[in-house]
């Protein structure tokens, strides 16, 4: 009942997780405005599930602050969910500047626009468990563990967490806008055609009758289904 009639502005709605979230929110009676780049894969869950038919979808770049401002303030959301990101570790080695521009500066621009939105009550900032300084511990990380990251992607997400914390304490608290970060682990589920994902890579190898290549066989990672509450 909480989501019924709520207005949610969702960045990154064309991605794997964003598409599932769009469908779920729409099924709960939420009015969703999506703002994102074109789907990152072909095929994509966004296209196959025809997500654009159940929500208001706008193709745009979070780095374009003017377009983002016009889109968000015209929609007048109650809740902002920020999922747009450059999400790939290996790609971040090839494009570190783009990774920081999207994940750090892009997040700052989203939050800067958000604090101009008079109807906004809450922000959910989606990041990753890779935002922590990796000390190779065998236990899980705690919320107050230090941010860090060895590679450009991971460190960009640590930076994004610091940006969100600064905006919360400097601006959003006094405006009565709540902000929380959600740090996901490895997410699996139907509709994921991205590269460098364990389950899709295994299935692609099976289809081609090729050996399955595990990049980091000694790594221990948390797993969750995309629809897991």
What is each model feature region?
Residues 86, 228-229:
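Alpha-helical and His/Cys-centered functional microenvironments
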Residues 1-184:
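N-terminal Rossmann-like NAD(P)+-binding domain of SDR-like oxidoreductases, especially those catalyzing
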Residues 107, 195-199:
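Amphipathic alpha-helical segments in well-structured domains
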Residues 92, 144-146, 174-191, 201-224:
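A conserved pocket-lining segment of Rossmann-fold NAD(P)-dependent short-chain dehydrogenase/reductase
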Residues 57-63, 102, 188-196, 217-228:
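Substrate-binding strand-loop-helix patch
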């Amino acid at each position: 009942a909480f989501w019924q009639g709520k207005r949610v502005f969702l960045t990154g709605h064309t991605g794997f997780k964003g598409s599932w979230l769009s469908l779920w929110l729409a099924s709960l009676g939420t009015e969703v405005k999506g703002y994102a780049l074109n789907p990152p894969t072909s095929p994509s869950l966004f296209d196959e599930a025809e997500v654009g038919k159940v929500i208001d979808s706008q193709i745009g770049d979070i780095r374009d602050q003017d377009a983002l401002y016009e889109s968000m303030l015209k929609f007048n959301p109650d809740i902002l969910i920020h999922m747009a990101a450059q999400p790939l570790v290996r790609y971040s080695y090839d494009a570190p500047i783009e990774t920081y521009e999207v994940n750090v500066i892009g997040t700052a621009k989203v939050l800067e626009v958000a604090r101009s939105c008079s109807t906004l009550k809450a922000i959910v900032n989606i990041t990753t468990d890779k935002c922590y300084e990796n000390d190779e511990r065998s236990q899980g990380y705690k919320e107050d563990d230090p941010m860090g990251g060895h590679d450009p992607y991971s460190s960009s997400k640590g930076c994004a967490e610091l940006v969100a914390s600064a905006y919360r304490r400097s601006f959003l608290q006094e405006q009565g806008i709540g902000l929380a970060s959600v740090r996901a682990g490895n997410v699996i589920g139907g509709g994921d055609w991205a590269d460098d994902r364990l389950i899709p890579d295994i299935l692609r190898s099976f289809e081609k009758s090729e050996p399955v290549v595990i990049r980091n066989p000694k790594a221990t990672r948390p797993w969750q289904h995309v629809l897991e509450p």
